[in-house]
Swiss-Prot record:
The gene is env. The keyword Membrane applies. Disulfide bonds join 53-73, 118-207, 125-198, 130-158, 220-249, 230-241, 298-332, 378-436, 385-409, 588-594. Keywords: AIDS, Apoptosis, Clathrin-mediated endocytosis of virus by host, Cleavage on pair of basic residues, Coiled coil, Disulfide bond, Fusion of virus membrane with host endosomal membrane, Fusion of virus membrane with host membrane, Glycoprotein, Host cell membrane, Host endosome, Host membrane, Host-virus interaction, Lipoprotein, Membrane, Palmitate, Signal, Transmembrane, Transmembrane helix, Viral attachment to host cell, Viral envelope protein, Viral immunoevasion, Viral penetration into host cytoplasm, Virion, Virus endocytosis by host, Virus entry into host cell. A lipid is attached at residue 754 (S-palmitoyl cysteine). Residues 713-722 have a biased composition (Basic and acidic residues). Residues 696-846 are cytoplasmic. Residues 385-409 are annotated as: V4. One of its GO terms (biological process) is positive regulation of receptor clustering. Residues 32-674 are extracellular. Belongs to the HIV-1 env protein family. This is Envelope glycoprotein gp160. Residues 130-157 are annotated as: V1. It comes from Human immunodeficiency virus type 1 group M subtype F1 (isolate 93BR020).
Length: 846
C-alpha cells in the first residue's frame, strides 16, 4: 500500500536556509554604524587665548623708545590672507569680547612699562612760590584773536628750593607750571602753591626720549586658533553675521587714548552705525561709527623752551624754561560745514531708534576734566579741549554757518593715569610749536535719563578706554580650531595591527577653514589638503616669533609683546601636541581618516548617513554631538586599550603556549555557549521552515499528516524491492516513518545539515583543486614557454654580440695594419735619405 504525504527535500531546505541566514547577516551588518575619527575637519568653538602683535614700527617711527614698543612685534604679512566662509553664520558680541579686555590690559602694561625706569617726582612736593608769567614778546604786527589769548594766570612762574648734586646743599630754582597742575596751599596767600597730586598719588616723570605717537598694531592669533571677521557693512556688533571670513591678524589699530571723540580709527563702509549694549539704558555708552571722517587740526602756538633742573644725584626734572613771543592758547580747528553735515546724519540715525522724540545735543553735564573735555595726546602734550561748540544745537540749526569751529584747549603736564586711580604722570614739556592733524572717526555719547519723552538729549562722554578699543574690535572674535571630529560610517576596524608611528599633520586656520560651509561629505574629500597646512603654518609662525624674540635679546627685559610671543609659541606647540596625543591614544597617529570598532549609538544622533553626510556641515554636526564628545572619546580610548591588550596576548601566545589551556573550564563554557547558540539557531530555522512548508501546502489543498504517518520514499532503480524471501517487484516506493521526539528531530536536522555542508564543501574543494591544478599546469607551461623564449633570445643576443665584436675586431685590425704599414714606409723613407744623398753625390762626381 502506498502512503502519500509530504516529502521533505532536505537539499533544497538547506540551500534556502543558508540563503536566508546569509541575507539576515548581511542586512544586520548593513544596519550597524561605527565611529570614525576625522582629523582636519573645519570646526571651531569660541575661545580665549593669548594674542600676539604684528606691526611695521620701523616704517612709522624710527625712535626706539616709542611707548607702544611695537618694535618687539612680528613684522606684518605683506600679503595677508583672508578666506571667506561660504554658507556660514556666526554670532558676535562686541560687549563680551575678550580681545577688548586683552588689548586694554596690553595698553596699560605698555604705559606702566614706559614709566618704570623714569624719575619719581616726590622731591617736588614742596612749597612753590608762584607769580603770573611775564612775557618777553614784542609788539607783533599780526593781531591775535582775543579768544586765543591765554589768561595771564594760566601759566605760573614758580620758584622752589631743591637739592643739588651735593645732598646738604640746596639751590633755589624756578620753573613754569600750568595753573591746572598746581593748587593753592593757603587761601589767604595767593602765592604759595603745591603740585596738585602730592596729597593723593605718586607722580612719575615720563622719560625724555619717549614718543607718544600711536603706531598701528595688528593683533594675531597663534597657531591652532583663528580670528573670525564679520564683513557686513551695517553690523551693529551684536547678533548673527552671515558674511564671515577668517583672518590671521586684525587690521592696524592705533591705540589712541581719547575721550568724547574717537580719533584716527576706521570708518564705517556703509551708513553711520550706532552701537550700544542697550540703547534704551541711559547708563550705557553709545558708540557712533562715522562713515566720513572730519578733520581736526590742533596746535600749541607757543614757542616754548625746555630746561633741566637737578633734583639730586641721578635725578633730573624737565620743565619749561621760557615762552618766546605772546602767550596764546592751545586750540583745535574743525570745519563747520563738515561737522554740521556729520551731526545731521548722526541725528537722523539716532532718530531711527527714537522715532517719537526730537534728537538734541548738548555739552557735557560735568565730572572730571578728562570727561568734560576732549582729552587726547598731541606730540607728547596732553590737550583738554572744550567741545561745547561742537555740540551746540542752536549754532548748527543755522544752515548758513560754514565757518571754522575753534575749540579752546588747556594743557596739563600732571595727568591722572587713566588706567589706575591714585597715580599721576608728569609729561615733559615739548620745545617749539606743536601741531597735530587728526581725523574724527567716531563719537562717544551718553543719553540723558528722565521721563521727558518728547526730547532725547545726547552729550559727549567717554573715559572708559575699553569703548575705544571696542570701536575697532567690534567685528572680530577669536575661535579655537577643533580639527578632530567623529562621525558614523559603515566602516569598522576589523583587525588589530601594530601601527607604524608616522609623522603627524595638522590644520592651519585660514585655507583650512575655507570648507566650513560645505557639507561633511564634500569637506572630508579635501582632508589631506586641509591637514597638510597646519604643521607648515605652525613652523612658519614659530619662526617669525622666534626672530622677533631674538631681536629683543639686547634689552634687559622683554616688553609685554615679547612675553606674549613666548606665550603664543608655547601655546601653539601645546595645542598641536594635544591633538597628536589623542590620535596616538586612539591608534590613529598619522591618519586623516581612522576607523574604529566602537559602535555608533543612536542616542547620540539618530540621523541617517545620507542626512549627515549630504546635508549637514561639520559645524552643525559638531553642535549635534558636542554633548557626547567626551563619552565617544572615552569609548574610543577604551577600545584601543583593549585592542592593545589583545595584541599583546596574541604576540606573547600566553593562552596557546600550553595544551592544558584546552582543559580550562572557562574555555569549555565558552565553547558550550557557542554550541548551544548554533543548535538553537538551527532548531529555530527548522521550526520556521516547517511551519512555512505546512502553511504553503495547506493553501494548496493538502492536510498536515501526523508525525507518526509513514510516507512513501522512492527507492533507487538499481535496488530490488523487499528481502530475499519476498521477491518480485512490489512498486517503486516504500514507506518510511518520520522521526519522533525533540532530540531525534534536532539530531536528524543537524545530521542532514552536516551532510549537506560536507557534500557541498567537498564539491567546492574538488572544483577549486581542479581549477588550481589547471592554473598551475598552465602557469608551468607559460613559465616553460617564457624560459625557452628567454633562452632563444639570449642565444640570439649572444650570437649578435659575438658577430659585432668579430666585425669590430676585423675592422680595427685592418685599420691598424694600414697605419703600421704607412708608418713603416715613412720610417724607411727617412732612413734612406742619407743613402739617397750619397748616391746623388756619387753620380755627380762620375
Amino acid at each position: 500500500m502506498r502512503v502519500r504525504g509530504m516529502q521533505r527535500n532536505w537539499q533544497h531546505l538547506g540551500k534556502w536556509g543558508l540563503l536566508f541566514l546569509g541575507t539576515l547577516i548581511i542586512c544586520n551588518a548593513a544596519e550597524n554604524l561605527w565611529v570614525t575619527v576625522y582629523y582636519g575637519v573645519p570646526v571651531w568653538k569660541e575661545a580665549t587665548t593669548t594674542l600676539f602683535c604684528a606691526s611695521d614700527a620701523k616704517s612709522y617711527e624710527k625712535e626706539a623708545h616709542n611707548v607702544w614698543a611695537t618694535h618687539a612685534c612680528v613684522p606684518t604679512d605683506p600679503n595677508p590672507q583672508e578666506v571667506v566662509l561660504e554658507n556660514v553664520t556666526e554670532r558676535f558680541n562686541m560687549w563680551e569680547n575678550n580681545m577688548v579686555e586683552q588689548m586694554h590690559t596690553d595698553i596699560i602694561s605698555l604705559w606702566d612699562q614706559s614709566l618704570k625706569p623714569c624719575v619719581k617726582l616726590t622731591p617736588l612736593c614742596v612749597t612753590l612760590d608762584c607769580r603770573n608769567i611775564a612775557t618777553n614778546g614784542t609788539n607783533d604786527t599780526i593781531a591775535i584773536n582775543d579768544t586765543l589769548k591765554e589768561d595771564p594766570e594760566a601759566i605760573q612762574n614758580c620758584s622752589f628750593n631743591t637739592t643739588t648734586e651735593i645732598r646738604d646743599k640746596q639751590l633755589k630754582v624756578h620753573a613754569l607750571f600750568y595753573k591746572l597742575d598746581i593748587v593753592q596751599i593757603n587761601k589767604d596767600d595767593n602765592r604759595t602753591y603745591r603740585l596738585i597730586n602730592c596729597d593723593a598719588s605718586t607722580i612719575t616723570q615720563a622719560c625724555p626720549k619717549v614718543s607718544w605717537d600711536p603706531i598701528p598694531i595688528h593683533y594675531c592669533a597663534p597657531a591652532g586658533y583663528a580670528i573670525l571677521k564679520c564683513n557686513e557693512k551695517n553690523f551693529t556688533g551684536t547678533g548673527s553675521c552671515k558674511n564671515v571670513s577668517t583672518v590671521q591678524c586684525t587690521h592696524g589699530i592705533k591705540p589712541v587714548v581719547s575721550t568724547q571723540l574717537l580719533l584716527n580709527g576706521s570708518l564705517a563702509e556703509g551708513e553711520i552705525v550706532i552701537r550700544s549694549q542697550n540703547i534704551s539704558d541711559n547708563a550705557k555708552t553709545i558708540i557712533v561709527h562715522l562713515n566720513e571722517s572730519v578733520q581736526i587740526n590742533c596746535t600749541r602756538p607757543n614757542n616754548n623752551t625746555r630746561k633741566r633742573i637737578s633734583l639730586g644725584p641721578g635725578r633730573v626734572f624737565y620743565t619749561t624754561g621760557e615762552i618766546i613771543g605772546d602767550i596764546r592758547k592751545a586750540h583745535c580747528n574743525v570745519s563747520g560745514t563738515q561737522w554740521r553735515n556729520t551731526l545731521a546724519k548722526v541725528k537722523a540715525k539716532l532718530g531711527s531708534y527714537f522715532p517719537n522724540a526730537t534728537i538734541k545735543f548738548n555739552s557735557s553735564s560735568g565730572g572730571d576734566l578728562e570727561i568734560t573735555r576732549h582729552n587726547f595726546n598731541c606730540m607728547g602734550e596732553f590737550f583738554y579741549c572744550n567741545t561745547d561748540e561742537l555740540f551746540n544745537d542752536t549754532k548748527f540749526n543755522d544752515t548758513g554757518f560754514n565757518g571754522t569751529i575753534t575749540l579752546p584747549c588747556r594743557i596739563k603736564q600732571i595727568v591722572n593715569m587713566w588706567q589706575e586711580v591714585g597715580r599721576a604722570m608728569y609729561a615733559n614739556p615739548i620745545a617749539g610749536n606743536i601741531t597735530c592733524n587728526s581725523n574724527i572717526t567716531g563719537l562717544l555719547l551718553t543719553r540723558d535719563g528722565g521721563l521727558n519723552s518728547t526730547n532725547e538729549t545726547f552729550r559727549p562722554g567717554g573715559g572708559n578706554m575699553k569703548d575705544n578699543w571696542r570701536s575697532e574690535l567690534y567685528k572680530y572674535k577669536v575661535v579655537e580650531i577643533e580639527p578632530l571630529g567623529v562621525a558614523p560610517t559603515k566602516a569598522k576596524r576589523q583587525v588589530v595591527k601594530r601601527e607604524r608611528r608616522a609623522v603627524g599633520l595638522g590644520a592651519l586656520f585660514l585655507g583650512f577653514l575655507g570648507a566650513a560651509g560645505s557639507t561633511m561629505g564634500a569637506a572630508s574629500i579635501t582632508l589631506t589638503v586641509q591637514a597638510r597646512q597646519l604643521l607648515s603654518g605652525i613652523v612658519q609662525q614659530q619662526s617669525n616669533l622666534l626672530r622677533a624674540i631674538e631681536a629683543q635679546q639686547h634689552l634687559l627685559q622683554l616688553t609685554v609683546w615679547g612675553i606674549k610671543q613666548l606665550q603664543a609659541r608655547v601655546l601653539a606647540v601645546e595645542r598641536y601636541l594635544k591633538d597628536q596625543q589623542l590620535l596616538g591614544l586612539w591608534g590613529c597617529s598619522g591618519k586623516l581618516i581612522c576607523t574604529t570598532n566602537v559602535p555608533w549609538n543612536s542616542s547620540w544622533s539618530n540621523k541617517s548617513l545620507e542626512e549627515i553626510w549630504g546635508n549637514m556641515t561639520w559645524m552643525e554636526w559638531e553642535k549635534e554631538v558636542s554633548n557626547y564628545s567626551k563619552e565617544i572619546y572615552r569609548l574610543i580610548e577604551d577600545s584601543q586599550n583593549q585592542q592593545e591588550k589583545n595584541e599583546q596576548e596574541l604576540l606573547a601566545l600566553d593562552k596557546w603556549a600550553s595544551l592544558w589551556n584546552w582543559f580550562d573550564i572557562t574555555q569549555w563554557l565558552w565553547y558550550i555557549k557557542i554550541f548551544i547558540m548554533i543548535v538553537g539557531g538551527l532548531i529555530g530555522l527548522r521550526i520556521v521552515f516547517t511551519v512555512l512548508s505546512i502553511v504553503n501546502r495547506v493553501r494548496k489543498g493538502y492536510s498536515p499528516l501526523s508525525f507518526q504517518t509513514h510516507i512513501p520514499s522512492p527507492r533507487e532503480p538499481d535496488r530490488p524491492e523487499g528481502i530475499e524471501e519476498g521477491g518480485g517487484e512490489q512498486g517503486k516506493d516504500r514507506s518510511v516513518r518520520l522521526v519522533t521526539g525533540f532530540l531525534a528531530l534536532a539530531w536528524d536536522d543537524l545530521r542532514n545539515l552536516c551532510l549537506f555542508s560536507y557534500r557541498h564543501l567537498r564539491d567546492f574543494i574538488l572544483i577549486a583543486a581542479r581549477i588550481v591544478d589547471r592554473g598551475l599546469k598552465r602557469g608551468w607551461e607559460a613559465l616553460k614557454y617564457l624560459g625557452n623564449l628567454t633562452q632563444y633570445w639570449g642565444q640570439e643576443l649572444k650570437n649578435s654580440a659575438i658577430s659585432l665584436l668579430n666585425a669590430t675586431a676585423i675592422a680595427v685590425a685592418e685599420w691598424t695594419d694600414r697605419v703600421i704599414e704607412a708608418l713603416q714606409r715613412a720610417g724607411r723613407a727617412i732612413l734612406n735619405i742619407p743613402r739617397r744623398i750619397r748616391q746623388g753625390l756619387e753620380r755627380a762626381l762620375l
